[in-house]
């Protein structure tokens, strides 16, 4: 990123703009700042200062270390909220997460899923709601699966009553 881009970007803008991070949605500042949503996260005051600054400060020594994990864990919480589910729903409908590679699923849109809620266990996978299988995404992403967690697809379909999993559709 050039220094001219740094002047108009926050850490969040920079991080979301990195190739491979397209599965993530933007967590609103008010959600990030709410201390209830920060419970159990380490170093929140120091990291919060870095990720919410209007300018990225590369001299802070923290860039892309703890911030990535911290934002990822806030993201995992946010996508389970009403606003987060709506944001992920838009991405799902656009096909931002890719489609199922299984031919019998007829290019079914997929959702991101983590195989573990524990940071560092595995990278994100894509989950097909039709065949209920998990696959490696075609996109070049190395996001940690904990940014989504293992229950996200189930929560997504249970919390959005107007959506049904294709397996529940009698036409399939």
From Swiss-Prot:
SUPFAM superfamilies: Casein kinase II beta subunit
Signal peptide: none
Tissue expression from the record: Probably not expressed in wild-type flies. In males lacking the Y chromosome, it is testis-specific and constitutes the main component of star-shaped crystals.
Pfam families for the chain: CK_II_beta
InterPro entries for the chain: Casein_kin_II_reg-sub_N, Casein_kinase_II_beta-like, Casein_kinase_II_reg-sub
GO CC terms in record: cytoplasm; nucleus; protein kinase CK2 complex
Disulphide linkage map: none
GO molecular function (one): protein kinase regulator activity
Conditions for induction: In wild-type flies, it is strongly down-regulated by double-stranded RNA (dsRNA) interference mediated by Su(Ste) transcripts. In males lacking the Y chromosome, the absence of Su(Ste) locus, relieves such down-regulation, explaining why it is strongly expressed.
Gene3D superfamilies: 2.20.25.20, protein kinase ck2 holoenzyme, chain C, domain 1
Family, per entry: Belongs to the casein kinase 2 subunit beta family.
Record's function text: Unknown. In males lacking the Y chromosome, its strong overexpression leads to the appearance of proteinaceous star-shaped crystals in the primary spermatocytes causing meiotic drive, possibly by interfering with normal casein kinase 2 activity.
Additional facts recorded: There are multiple copies of the stellate gene in fruit fly, encoding proteins that are extremely similar, which makes their individual characterization difficult. Thus, most experiments probably do not discriminate between the different members.
Subunit structure: Interacts in vitro with the casein kinase 2 alpha subunit (CkII-alpha). The relevance of such interaction is however unclear in vivo.
The protein's name in its UniProt record: Stellate protein CG33236/CG33240/CG33244/CG33245
Species: Drosophila melanogaster (Fruit fly)
Organism placement in taxonomy: Eukaryota, Metazoa, Ecdysozoa, Arthropoda, Hexapoda
Encoding gene per record: Ste:CG33236
């Amino acid at each position: 990123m050039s220094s001219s881009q740094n002047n108009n970007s926050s850490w969040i803008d920079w991080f979301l703009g990195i190739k491979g991070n397209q599965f993530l949605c933007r967590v609103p500042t008010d959600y990030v700042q709410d201390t209830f949503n920060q419970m159990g996260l380490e170093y929140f005051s120091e990291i919060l200062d870095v990720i919410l600054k209007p300018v990225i400060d590369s001299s802070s020594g923290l860039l892309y270390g703890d911030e990535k994990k911290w934002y990822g864990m806030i993201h995992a919480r946010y996508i389970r909220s009403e606003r987060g589910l709506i944001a992920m729903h838009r991405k799902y409908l656009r096909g931002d997460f890719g489609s199922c590679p299984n031919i019998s699923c007829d290019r079914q849109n997929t959702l991101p899923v983590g195989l573990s809620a524990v940071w560092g266990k595995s990278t994100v996978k894509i989950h097909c709601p039709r065949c209920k299988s998990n696959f490696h995404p075609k996109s070049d992403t190395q996001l940690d699966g904990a940014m989504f967690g293992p229950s996200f697809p189930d929560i997504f379909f249970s919390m959005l009553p107007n959506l049904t999993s294709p397996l529940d559709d009698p036409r399939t």
